[in-house]
Amino acid sequence: GLPSCLLCLCLGTSVYCDDAGLEHIPALPPDTTYLYARFNRIGAVRAGDFSGLEKLKHIDLSGNSISRADADAFRLLPSLQELLLPQNLLRELPELPRAIVRLDASLNRIASAGLRPGAFRDLKQLQFLHLSDNQLDFIPVPLPESLRSLHLQNNNIRTMHEDTFCDSQEQGQIRRALEDIRLDGNPINLSLFPNAFFCLPRLPTGRFS
């Protein structure tokens, strides 16, 4: 296809492709650090779409029609810190690179079966995990200690474990970072799990009756 700088606006190492009628990820200059390709008609992200883009730090694909992302579409990007995929049609989450700090895949169709077991365990930099307005049945565990913000509102979460957030064997545990948990808009009654929040700086937002 056409080099992205003809279809999009290239400013320094940022590429702006918002609302450009794109159906595929465009070919990007090798030194690209930021990609904004919001509100297009992109339907899939393939394994080779970002190959060789070792400086790419930020990808925003909000408001496309992405129903499929290959397992390796993002995993091999060594510098990727922010991946924004809200308002798409994803049913499962692709593997994530180790450097990821912020993931937003809200307003998709992701069910718990679409998350690999332990999908977030090894993401030691992850601070913001936003999966609101999906079809999740469970809170994904384990969650890395780095996590600051967990948005799971408007899913189908009905239950949780005493150990979901806190280690019940370690009563002195404090998770200082994790101070923003949203579980509102789920069927779960949080008052049924009185011992599940002792390590948190503040209670989750959600139903307590």
Model-derived segments and spans:
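N-terminal interaction/assembly modules
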Residues: 110-111, 115, 123, 128, ...
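Conserved LRR concave beta-strand detector
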Residues: 14, 34, 44, 55-58, ...
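Glycine/serine-rich loop-strand microenvironments at binding/catalytic pocket rims
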Residues: 127-152
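LRR N-terminal entry segment and analogous cap-like coil->beta motifs
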Residues: 9-49, 53-58, 62
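Consensus "Asn ladder" position of solenoid repeat domains
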Residues: 20, 40, 61-64, 85-88, ...
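Leucine-rich repeat
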Residues: 18, 23, 43, 67, ...
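A structural signal for leucine-rich repeat
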Residues: 26-29, 48-53, 71-77, 93-100, ...
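Membrane-proximal C-terminal cap and juxtamembrane stalk of leucine-rich repeat ectodomains
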Residues: 1-14, 167, 172-209
